[in-house]
Structures are given as structure tokens and as C-alpha cells.
């Protein structure tokens, strides 16, 4: 017969007391929520009480989300990356961090995605640290007025619509009018100037981006450029944040007393991506189904392009950089539909920027490239940044072209024209021809100055319109071979005085006497 074990009540209470004494609680303070719905790259979570707007939310498998909608009993977040590993019922936890991307000189020459991860197969990036993608734009006190030029190397822009360092100049036009070509030429022309460039491709085909990267490499411009890509196959979330990521990478150089140029190609696709996200988050739609804060989407991005004064640079670098101003120049691109610049997003961006370069389909199709409509294009602050030679010689060009366009339309109906009108029309035709320029062939300040000098002083009046491009090319070759010192002097100082005028006059007359074009 088995022996029964009898326990005293006092022993039971002793055992319980021991267990209570030995019991320890290891707690981890975590703000966790549960996924209640997951579709179209948007996740809704219940239980994240302390989440902040714009905070990163971590999901299982290292996937992150961005909290955008904070509602009473749920949080709407957009997933950055692959959502196929997530499922309803899984947990998401707050990280206490906002979205950051790598910054630094190690990114130059690289192609990265919207989160700063390399996608060019050249190995890991040695960054100088991380920086948040959303920042407050420089205040009025910390800014400095724009007074230095960004040379694009395109005669039509540098003479008529000059861009200054720290300016925001919009490039606007229909599809296939050469918007990207202008921006890429501007990046290529910064080679050797010390200006760092960032090219942000939003919603473009991978093949288009690959061909742009190849062109930059061919012209030796990739080494001073960061390419940020959120392609057409990427999620709307990445297309929405890519411009902010690129801006942060460009700001790194501005805050260290250097000059940077950023191209957003294009902000129309970013607006589409943001509209998609907003509608999926069930935000109330407004005009053209865009959310109410679509203006703020672009204004908070473009206001970060600025020129900051030396005191601010010294403060931001903790006294390491003294006496240097920094700048970030923005060239946002907007695509219009059938030339409609009065649509919602184009009018928003026109009102935010400091001027626009308007590209015309009809001009493009008639062979005028770059197809810049000088009547609708304007630069509101760039004039103060122009070099003396460009200001002096290019001043009359814009007016002459505007008058020519007006007269050209009128002359179609008039049978007999007086001599003054005919001369003006002929001069306009010559200026139009002279403003044409091949892609990937930017000119120096001196070369542009020579071209403007010959048209301003009437040296083209006896040159047939169809020979102007060969005349200009031969003149540049002649100047480079026999008057290199003069070109160098103009490039160095950008000055224009009686002495330079006399030298240019002598050189052009010598060239015309050779008749070698």
C-alpha cells in the first residue's frame, strides 16, 4: 500500500511565501500596437497610444512604416518597403525616431534609393552620419541674399533667365519638351566649379534613370552628383519621401559652407504619389482629388533651398568653418498637360518658386532647342547674380525676342512691312537661331559672352540665318585657338569694360575677315 503524503497547512503557506519571495518581474516598456488592417501598402494599427506624427514604426522582419494618420482609436501608417511579410494580428512598435537618411561626401558618385540604400552595386556607402528627412527651413535672419550665379552653360538661360545660388527656379512644360535635358546640362556644367549636385528621379522608368546615370558618367559629372531614385515600380510612399531625402543630402553641403544644386524630376509625380497615399488613408479629397495640404507638401520642400550666411554656417559646424556662406539651389520640374500652367499643382509651385523656365511644345517641334518661351519665362532674383558681361550683353536679347514673337504673329497678316519692322524681324530670327544649343554641350561664360557680343553689335546682320550655327562654332574655335588669354580673363572675372569690348571687337572683325565659316 502506497504511503500517503500529508502536508501541513503551515508548510503550504511557507511554500507560497517562498515562491512569492523568489518571484521577479522583468518588464520592458514597449508601446505596441496590433495590425487590424493591411492593404495597398497602408497599415492600420490599434493600441499605439503614444505614437508621434511622422514617427517610424517597426514591424516583424525589419520592415518599417511611417505614421501619417493619428486617429482616436487607430493609427494609419504607410509601409516603406515590402509589405508581403506582414499580416493582420502582428505587432508594430514605436521606435521614438523619425525617418533619417545617410548624408556626407561618401554619397557622391552613387545611386541610392529613397531611404539612402545603395542600388548601384558598388558596395556599402561610407556616410558621415544620419540626418532627418524633414527639417525646418532656414529663417529670414540666417539667410543671405542671392548674389552669385549658377551657370547652366545654356545661353538662353544664363542670358535671359539667370539662376542664382540659393534660388528656386521651376522648369515647367509638357512631356517630351526637354525639361530633364536642361537639368542634366546644368549638372554637367557644374564640373570643376565645386558645386555638388543631387538628382532626384521620382516615378521614372528604370531605363530612363540608367541612361541619365550613364550620360553623367560619360561627361565626368557623376563624381560630384548623388542620384536618388524612387522609380515607377517603387511604392507611392518611397516616391513621396524621395525629394525630402535628396534635399537632406544636399543640405549637408549647404550647412558646411559649400554650394549645392538639387533637381527634383519631377514634383508632379510626387504629388500624384501623395494623393494616392492620402486617398488610401481616407483623408478628405479637395480640388482634383488632392488632399488639403498639397501646397504644404511642396512649400516645405522648396523653402529649404536657400543661401545661408557665414554666421549660420559657423554655428552649424561648431566653429569649424568660418567666413563661408552655403547655398542649396533647387531646380524643380513640373509636367503640364497640354500646356495648361493654370492647373492646380503647376500654379502652386509657380507661386512657391522664384521664377520659371517655360518650355513650349511648338518651339520644340519647330527645332528651337532648348524650347524656352522667353515671354512666359522669368527669373525673379537671378538678375542680381548675373556676371557683368552677361548682364550687359544679354539685357537686350530678351526684349528683342519678345518683340520678335509679337511682330512675327502680326507680320503673317501684313503684306508690306516697313524697313524698321523688317530689320527687327531679321534680328529676332538671328537671335532665335543663336539661342539654339545642342544637348550635353554647355558653354563657358566667355563663349556665351562672345556669342551675345556678335548679335548685340550687329556682326550677324550679314550672316545668312541658316549659317549662324556654323558661324558660331567656327568663331568659338577661332577664339579658343588665337585669343585664349582673353577668354580666360572673361571666365575668371566675368567683367565687361571698354578694354574687353575693344578686344572682342578686334577679334570678331579679324575672324569675319577670314571668312572661314
Swiss-Prot record:
Keyword field contains Lipoprotein: no
Q: What is its main location?
A: membrane
Name of the protein: ATP synthase subunit alpha
Domain of life, source organism: Bacteria
* Topology class, membrane: Peripheral membrane protein
The chemistry this enzyme catalyses reads: ATP + H2O + 4 H(+)(in) = ADP + phosphate + 5 H(+)(out)
Q: Which Gene3D superfamilies match?
A: 2.40.30.20, ATP synthase alpha/beta chain, C-terminal domain (1.20.150.20), P-loop containing nucleotide triphosphate hydrolases (3.40.50.300)
For this UniProt entry, the molecular function terms from Gene Ontology, in alphabetical order, are: ADP binding; ATP binding; proton-transporting ATP synthase activity, rotational mechanism
Q: Which residues form the signal peptide?
A: none
Which parts of the sequence bind ATP? 173-180
Which EC numbers characterise this protein's activity in its record?
7.1.2.2
Keywords, alphabetical: ATP synthesis, ATP-binding, Cell inner membrane, Cell membrane, CF(1), Hydrogen ion transport, Ion transport, Membrane, Nucleotide-binding, Translocase, Transport
Which gene specifies this protein's sequence?
atpA
